[in-house]
Curated annotation (Swiss-Prot):
GO CC aspect terms: nucleus
Keyword Metal-binding: yes
Protein name in the entry: Zinc finger protein 491
BP GO terms, sorted: regulation of transcription by RNA polymerase II
Alphabetically ordered keywords of this record: DNA-binding, Metal-binding, Nucleus, Repeat, Transcription, Transcription regulation, Zinc, Zinc-finger
UniProt cross-references to Gene3D superfamilies, sorted A to Z: Classic Zinc Finger (3.30.160.60)
Lineage: Eukaryota, Metazoa, Chordata, Craniata, Vertebrata
Species this chain originates from: Homo sapiens
Subcellular localization: Nucleus
Length: 437
């Protein structure tokens, strides 16, 4: 029987004694009829149960919350079996093992294992802190965050990947990057089993199951499931474009778009396919390409069951069921499937051609045309038909070509119902009806 370390005072409701104050009482500073707590070991007096319990553990060496991860694994390094005397410390300690990060920043997609961590980080958004950046004037709460923030201005990248030599400003960034080499995807969805290498991607995916959209625009009421989409949408109201290319003078509203744009100048393609060696500017293009090897089609239409490899194709397809009208150009009225294609089309009116070939100087108004042109210099034909082996420089060409083998004819004449493998063939045919009229 353990020593009774704490006893309720006379006149209390139950008079029960405890070896430790119960957890449900810890959040109460005092209770009616309960006196201050005196330690039998050292004689120190405490007004609260929590302080009393902590002191008892210090005196007796009692550590009730033991981490099973340390007990289960025979660690070869200097890591010891950890025992923590406070239950909330134990829960916080366990999170690196479970990868649980329950505290989300409402401003961005970063998540944290403890309230203290997120409070410290939130100051980077509010700008209320004692450490002021000499470059931009931003104030930070913590010296380590201040030093880390300064690297965004100085360009210092002290953390290097041992596999490929790529350098990063933050230690956490190099750890995440290393997963591209190891293939580690530690965050697994309990609903569908899909795995992710980033906690932010995992949480965003979870919301596709729950339908949760916690980020709501104050201007128009539109809601979003991730902060990046929400902030991007906000800029459609403000017109803000905070990311400017110093080489070309082009301003962009999204950091990811800015980074992708800069790779056009540097030629950097950090995302490399392990199967065929092809490299990509953006992670989304890389993931789409990976599916060409695996055959994965994660986007499935609930109406007809048709599946797609990328979200944009899926969204375009959904409009065939909803009857949603595509967006139109303000200059000429031409209709397009998305705002992205309106922007690209708009360059035909402005004459803007932001993508220039380093080999011959030829410029292009859209990135896909630029990449296609680059392949004419390299002689590269990365898209090969699985049926006959014929190779193509562009993904759209192989999709059209494969319809010869599959017999798919997705473009149908509204007048007579005749179907075609290409939209241009369908439009040409439809004109025969107007001529006959």
């Amino acid at each position: 029987m353990g020593e009774r370390l704490f006893e309720s005072a006379e006149g209390s409701q139950c008079g029960e004694t405890f070896t430790q104050v119960p957890e449900d009482m810890l959040n109460k500073k005092t209770l009616p009829g309960v006196k201050s707590c005196e330690s039998g070991t050292c004689g120190e007096i405490f007004m609260g149960y929590s302080s009393f319990n902590r002191n008892i553990r210090t005196d007796t060496g009692h550590q009730p919350h033991k981490c099973q991860k340390f007990l289960e694994k025979p660690y070869k390094h200097k890591q010891r079996r950890k025992a923590l005397s406070h239950s909330h410390c134990f829960r916080t300690h366990e999170r690196p093992h479970t990868r649980e990060k329950p505290f989300d920043c409402k401003e961005c997609e970063k998540s944290f294992i403890s309230p203290a961590s997120i409070r410290r980080y939130m100051v980077t958004h509010s700008g209320d802190g004692p450490y002021k950046c000499k470059f931009c004037g931003k104030a930070l709460d913590c010296l380590s965050l201040y030093l880390t923030h300064e690297r965004t201005h100085t360009g210092e990248k002290r953390y290097e990947c041992k596999q490929c030599g790529k350098a990063f400003s933050w230690h956490s960034s190099v750890r995440i990057h290393e997963r591209t080499h190891t293939g580690e995807k530690p965050y697994e969805c309990k609903e569908c089993g899909k795995s992710f290498n980033f906690s932010s991607s995992f949480r965003r995916h979870e919301r596709t199951h729950t339908g949760e959209k916690p980020y709501k625009c104050k201007e128009c009421g539109k809601a979003f499931n991730c902060p990046s989409s929400f902030h991007r949408h906000e800029r459609t109201h403000t017109g803000e474009k905070p990311y400017e290319c110093k080489l070309y003078g082009k301003a962009l509203s999204r950091l990811i778009s800015f980074r992708r744009h800069m790779r056009m100048h540097t030629g950097e393609r950090p995302h490399k396919c392990k199967i065929c060696g092809k490299a990509f500017y953006s992670p989304s293009s890389f993931q789409r390409h990976e599916r060409s090897h695996t055959g994965e089609k994660p986007y499935k239409c609930k109406q007809c069951g048709k599946a797609f490899t990328c979200s944009t194709s899926f969204q375009y397809h959904e409009r065939t069921h909803t009857g949603e009208k595509p967006d139109g150009c303000k200059q000429c009225g031409k209709a397009f499937r998305s705002a992205k294609y309106i922007r690209i089309h708009g360059r035909t009116h402005t004459g803007e051609k932001p993508y220039e070939c380093k080999q011959c100087g030829k410029a292009f108004h859209c990135v896909s045309s630029f990449h296609r042109h680059e392949r004419t210099h390299a002689g590269e034909k990365p898209y090969e038909c699985k049926h006959c082996g014929k190779a193509f420089t562009c993904s759209i060409y192989i999709r059209i070509h494969e319809r010869i083998h599959t017999g798919e004819k997705p473009y149908q004449c509204k007048e007579c119902g005749k179907a075609f493998i290409r939209s241009s063939y369908c439009r040409k045919h439809e004109r025969t009806h107007t001529i006959n009229i």
